[in-house]
Regions:
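N-terminal accessory scaffold of Fe(II)-dependent oxygenases
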Residues: 2-412, 420-437
Length: 437
């Protein structure tokens, strides 16, 4: 359950919060790197040890075609390193290949974390993804869980920081590794036996929903027609809560804390630490979903943790099978593939400061306690604290006409583009947002 307060927005070009890091050197030249782009002799095929590694290697092109298009942004020395690692892979020299991968990943990581994320050349993201692919293969030494878990983390890092290569092979590799890890464990998600009681307590003690005055309540409609929604809400830019439009989604019956852990518990995700992203102590950390649930939901760490504005459904397609694209998105100008689907998963008490989004937004509550968190950090975020406004510093805020609502399970809130809104989580929540044009 969540409380949402909003008001019409102003003109501007909102941007998402971005990663920033230290300065870095420039790049020179470009090439196509890989064992197939030179005359050096390489071992045909690949020398694999074990069925898991063979299954992963089978997802990649043949050795002669295993090459990466780098472009002019990437240093020639990096292209040579890519080629070297590829040749070591082809020869089955796993330890040496792993060493080359680590050097390659360190170099690419520095470039990925230099300056704003939007300015990072996609070629460097491909290099990073390539390094993660080879690293995952190198790590699959034994049949146990530990090696596969480490390899799975490498795949997730490539999915989080890299770009799609070889037909988005990292998603397929991660699926195989995840299935292997789960088959070895042969038990529910980590900590579920001890954490279930705590999780149930967290769900059974929600904060009472605040009463919303009728004159400021967001209107509610049950399954309006496309034409009615377009004429009365989309075109005028009016918020509305749509009821009954997602009741058929599998997640409405299947999803629970335990289910999320079972399907995604061993996957590495970015977690925001801090109650709101405008706080000075706010930060981001990488951890598995199981660790996130244990630390921030079950045991309720002092620092609030939030899996916010993350494209989890691209990373874990198994979860995407449990949701759908709202029919009303067909009224937009873009294609379905251009819709950005974000997951928002966290405990009671997280706050999304007053902000606006760059596109139309549908926000869906997925289970008995779900909520969103819109994490933009720059000029699309207001300086005003909605709950404790400084009216001496911002006197005109007292004149703002606002709407409010409390989202219940299965509700879908339409938030028009650039419409200012503020969100507070009233309970443990998992929500899905759809940004569309």
């Amino acid at each position: 359950m969540e409380q949402v307060v909003g008001s019409p927005g102003a003109e501007g070009t909102p941007t998402q919060h971005e990663r920033h890091a230290c300065d870095g050197a420039g790049a020179d030249g470009g090439c196509i790197a890989g064992a197939g782009c030179a005359a050096e002799a390489t071992t045909p095929g690949v020398v694999a040890s074990g069925p898991l590694r063979e299954a992963l290697r089978a997802l990649l092109p043949p050795q002669a075609e295993l090459r990466l298009e780098l472009g002019e942004a990437v240093d020639r020395s990096v292209g040579m390193l890519v080629q070297q690692a590829t040749e070591l892979l082809g020869g089955g020299r796993w330890d040496q290949c792993l060493q080359s991968c680590e050097v390659l990943l360190d170099y690419a990581w520095e470039r990925l974390n230099t300056g704003p994320w939007r300015d990072v050349d996609k070629a460097w993201r491909r290099v990073y993804a390539f390094g993660c692919v080879l690293k995952a293969l190198c790590l699959c030494e034994g049949p146990g869980e530990a090696a596969a878990t480490t390899a799975l983390r490498a795949c997730d890092m490539g999915l989080l920081m890299g770009a799609a290569i070889f037909g988005n092979v990292l998603v397929k590799m991660a699926a195989i590794l995840q299935a292997h890890v789960l088959s070895v464990k042969k038990r529910p998600a980590q900590g579920s036996s001890e954490e279930q009681p705590g999780a149930k307590r967290a769900r059974s003690e929600p904060v009472p929903a605040p009463k919303v005055p009728l004159d400021s309540a967001v209107p509610r409609l049950h399954c309006p027609s496309l034409q009615h929604f377009r004429e009365h809400f989309l075109l005028p830019g009016r918020p509305v809560i749509l009821e009954g439009v997602v009741d058929h989604w599998p997640c409405m019956k299947k999803w629970s804390l335990e289910y999320i852990q079972e399907v995604a518990g061993c996957r590495t995700v970015p977690v925001e630490v801090g109650s709101r992203y405008t706080d000075d102590e706010w930060s981001q950390r990488l951890m598995t979903v199981n660790d996130f649930v244990s630390k921030h939901i079950v045991n309720k760490a002092k620092d609030v943790g939030y899996l916010a504005q993350h494209q989890l459904f691209d990373q874990i397609p198994e979860l995407k099978q449990d949701i759908g694209i709202p029919d009303y998105c067909c009224l937009g100008r873009g294609e379905e593939e251009e819709i950005t689907i974000n997951a928002w998963f966290g405990p009671q008490g997280t706050v999304s400061p007053l902000h606006q989004d760059p596109q139309q937004n549908f926000l869906v509550q997925e289970s008995e306690a779900l909520y969103p968190h819109e994490t933009h950090l720059l000029h699309n975020t207001s300086q005003v604290d909605v709950e404790n406004p400084d009216l001496e510093k911002f006197p005109r805020f007292a004149e703002v006409q606002s709407l409010a609502c409390v989202l219940e399970p299965g509700d879908m809130l339409f938030i028009p583009v650039k419409h200012w809104h503020y969100v507070r989580a009233l309970d443990l929540s998992f929500s899905v947002s759809f940004w569309w044009t």
